[in-house]
Amino acid sequence: MQEKNTEMNRIKVLMLVIFAALFVGCENNPEDEDELFSIKHAKTLEGHTEWVYSVSWSPDGKKLASGSWDNTVIIWDANTGAKLKTLEGHRWYVISVCWSPDGKYVASCSEDKTVIIWDANTGEQVRTLERGDNRVLSVSWSPDGNYLAGGSVENDIVIWDANNGQEIKTLEGHSDRVITVSWSPDGRYLASGSKDKNVIIWDVNAGTELLTLEGHTNTLNSVCWSPDGKHLASGAYDANVIIWDAKTGAKTQILDGHNFSVYSVSWNADGKHLAVATTDPEVILRDVNNRESIQKAKGHFGTTRSVSWSPDGKKLASGACDNTVIIWNVK
């Protein structure tokens, strides 16, 4: 009888342990919940006849600009998906688009060796910037709206006065073509990524190189500042995204696990998540503090070339080689 009671007590203890483990396992962890997100297809925007190479949200989040290999830029209503304007003027592929901070203008660069500044409301060309035979591969507007930066095939970065189109400064330091450029949120610094596999952070006013960030093993395709300006994300043909400390140049995280080349990275407004575009026909969301966290959303039928978060962080736009733009809802 005593042995039976002892055995029953053991069973009771074991059951209590199991129930306790189940309770702990099912309990919600607020910190974990904060890191969870979901991405759902909202709408597909059709209007381009060739690959969509670049997408960019207007500062108020109401419009979207897309640049395509059909030589055009399209302005979309982000809420309805309606085509508002088709900007025609480039003679060859459009490879990069960006909005001015006040939302009045869109800048685009093309394989036709021109940069065009457009009136976003009327669709008219405001001015055309040229550098002879020097092609510009990426454009980025300064936060104050006064300057436009362009990375070029001549291994340098040109800074234009956006108000009159005058070239005011050239930044030299890369040993190969500059594929991507991005201004820091405070406008003091510029980041550039090159075919030479390096990222350079520049002091724009002084025109000097502050840091050279080495770590990628192939051509850089995209650089993007965190909203607070403390970190920089870069994506490359080596299929990796690297997070850098923008002050020291130290690597703080390497986000791997992508199957193919990384073409575009975009930081969410919360500073915790990155959107990534790769050779795969999908959009990838990454937690910048957890390299194991990967979420994928499928919707495109061709390589995803560009991703861009809306200013409020609730939507994401992607452009791809299936000639479409997709808007995603993100929670």
Stretches with model-predicted labels:
Residues 305-331:
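Blade-level signature of beta-propeller repeat domains, shared across WD40, Kelch, NHL, RCC1
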Residues 24-25:
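C-terminal motif of bacterial Sec signal peptides marking the signal peptidase cleavage site
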Residues 33-47:
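A short helix->beta-strand "capping" segment at the edge of beta-propeller domains
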Residues 50-53, 70-74, 92, 112-115, ...:
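Short coil/turn segments within WD40 beta-propeller repeats
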Residues 45-52, 88-94, 130-136, 172-178, ...:
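WD40/WD-repeat beta-propeller blade N-cap
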Residues 59-60, 101-102, 143-144, 185-186, ...:
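Residue-level detector of Asp-centered blade-edge/turn motifs that repeat once per structural unit
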